[in-house]
Curated annotation (Swiss-Prot):
Family listed: Belongs to the acetyl-CoA hydrolase/transferase family.
Species per Swiss-Prot/TrEMBL record: Acetobacter aceti
Residues that, per the record, bind CoA: G269, V270, G271, N272, V273, I364, N384, G388, K408
Subunit structure of this chain's protein: Homodimer.
Pfam families: AcetylCoA_hyd_C, AcetylCoA_hydro
Catalytic reaction(s) noted: succinyl-CoA + acetate = succinate + acetyl-CoA
UniProt pathway annotation: Metabolic intermediate biosynthesis; acetyl-CoA biosynthesis
Entry EC no(s): 2.8.3.18
UniProt GO BP: acetate catabolic process; acetyl-CoA biosynthetic process from acetate; succinyl-CoA catabolic process
Protein name (record): Succinyl-CoA:acetate CoA-transferase
Length: 505
């Protein structure tokens, strides 16, 4: 471990996780590293959860406000949720136990745009940060903190926190050192902010390590534990069909000179649909691709390996166990092709617009006019959060939403008369793709958009119902610009809640 903690003076701060966890008090605001299940602290949260459970058994209160980069893993969100140790959570979560706490009303939750979290923290929206808890690959001779498999909001939390706890994780590959690009300009401060001088996805503008006043470092914990690295389902026929429509669209846009032959910087969400698209791009005609995204997932890693993609910039990895092992074994090959940045840079709307990114994101549902619900099932039950989809959707050159046309074995339609919750308004959604087809909505009015979405994207089981609703709304709506029948616009959702299906009996 001495080669991991190369600053001799800081070795005296090494202690067990149990001791470090005692620094975290009831009511503290704690900012941690971690983004899409990568690079989050693992041992101190487990020790903290045990202390919380013991306090609760004594009838004492012991909860914290937990602010991260994005989702973490079972050792952090899972353990603290089991202990009922979080009274407020932001900005993104995928842990099932934490999700249950949120949807039961036991943990307050706000799914902020990921690109805005650092700025909100600097502005004091989350309160005063008592603790920054970050995972590191190593600590350099001059006290620099080498991040691990994500960057997230770590630098901002280190700047703001009164005390710092560092987990130095030996499981993380030491060759991660040098892969990060931490810009030390004023990204998120007020009242003025510096322009982040990125004009190409492959550009480095900062340094390789996080910086913090060493006097703030209160504890260093040695760990050896892997990231979440959840497996991805192999793309099914539905995902492959969606990918096929999108690849044909890209080819058409190149022929029309609306896209260059190498496309534009790609942003992609995670999951089997996203991986199917990336797999298709790996086999397709486009070369010298670049990624400017928030995550690097299996499909993007495969494109880097094949040479189809030359550089990928993000804030984090989100890999299957197999892909994580692959990159660990071949880090000397991949490290020159990857840049990990803080998330208020990876998700900066200004950079996204400057680079002209192509944004590809999933959704829970969209209405017939193209308003998108990415977060709340039936309008009220939180799934994960808006993540970075809002950062990219509004500012990208192309904003694309991908989804199977149905869910729950056909019991839910992804295209509905009115979205039960809206994360992305119609002005931020240009292209919709389901396994039924692709709707290009650029330059269309709401009525024209509805005709395209219903005919191109809706499932045949639901298409006649949508067409009937739209036809009657055209005749009887209060206004004819965006026709709706308010007495039945959300009736599909209520039918599912009442009967378990959106289809009428």
């Amino acid at each position: 471990m001495t080669e991991r903690i190369r600053n001799v003076a800081l070795r005296s701060k090494v202690c067990p996780a149990e001791t470090a966890s005692e620094l975290i008090k009831h009511g503290d605001v704690v900012g941690t590293s971690g983004f899409t299940g990568a690079g989050y602290p693992k041992e101190v949260p487990k020790a903290l959860a045990q202390r919380m459970e013991a306090a609760h058994d004594r009838g004492e209160k012991y909860q914290i406000s937990l602010i991260t980069g994005a989702s973490t893993g079972p050792q952090l969100d899972g353990e603290l949720a089991k202990a009922n140790g979080v009274y407020f959570r932001s900005p993104f979560n995928t842990d099932a136990t934490m999700r249950n706490r949120i949807n039961a009303g036991e943990t307050e939750y706000f799914d902020n745009h990921l690109g805005q979290v650092a700025g909100r923290a600097v502005q004091g929206n989350y309160g005063k940060f008592n603790i920054a808890l970050v995972e590191a690959t190593a600590i350099t001779e001059d006290g620099g903190i080498v991040p691990t498999s994500s960057v997230g909001n770590s630098q901002t939390f280190l700047n703001l926190a009164e005390k710092v706890i560092i987990e130095v994780n030996e499981w993380q590959n030491p060759m991660l050192e040098g892969i990060h690009d931490i810009w030390d300009g004023n990204v998120s401060g007020v009242p003025t902010r510096d322009i982040v001088p990125i004009v190409r996805a492959d550009q480095r503008v900062g340094g390789p390590v996080l910086r913090v006043n060493p006097d703030k470092i209160a504890a260093i914990v040695r760990t050896n534990d892997r990231d979440r690295n959840a497996p991805f389902a192999a793309p099914d026929e539905t995902a492959k069909a969606i990918a096929g429509y999108l690849l044909d669209f890209f080819g058409h846009e190149v022929k029309q000179n609306r896209l260059p032959p190498s496309l534009l910087p790609l942003q992609s969400g995670v999951g089997n649909v996203a991986n199917a698209v990336l797999e298709g791009l790996k086999e397709g005609p486009f070369e010298n691709l670049v990624g400017y995204s928030e995550v690097i997932q299996d499909g993007m890693l495969a494109m880097l390996d094949s040479g189809r993609m030359r550089i990928a910039s993000a804030s984090s990895f989100s890999l299957s166990p197999e892909a994580a092992e692959e990159i660990n074994n071949r880090m000397d090959f991949f490290r020159s092709k990857i840049i990990l940045r803080q998330q208020d840079v990876s998700n900066s709307p200004g950079i996204i617009r400057r680079l002209g990114c192509i944004a590809m994101n999933g959704m829970i549902e969209a209405d017939i006019y193209g308003n998108v619900n990415s977060t709340r099932v039936m309008g009220s039950k939180m799934m994960n959060g808006i993540g970075g989809s809002g950062d990219f959707a509004r500012s990208s050159y192309l904003s694309i939403f991908l989804s199977p046309s149905t869910a729950k074995g056909g019991k839910i339609s992804a295209i509905v008369p009115m979205a039960a919750h809206v994360d992305h308004i119609m002005q931020d959604a240009q292209i919709f793709v389901t396994e039924q087809g692709l709707a290009d909505l650029r330059g269309l009015s709401p009525v024209q958009r509805a005709r395209e979405i219903i005919s191109k994207c809706a499932h045949p089981d639901y298409r006649p119902m949508l067409q009937d609703y739209f036809d009657r709304a055209l005749k009887n709506s209060f206004g004819k610009h965006t026709p709706h029948l308010l007495t039945e616009a959300l009736s599909w959702h209520q039918r599912f809640i009442d009967t378990g299906t959106m289809l009428p009996s």
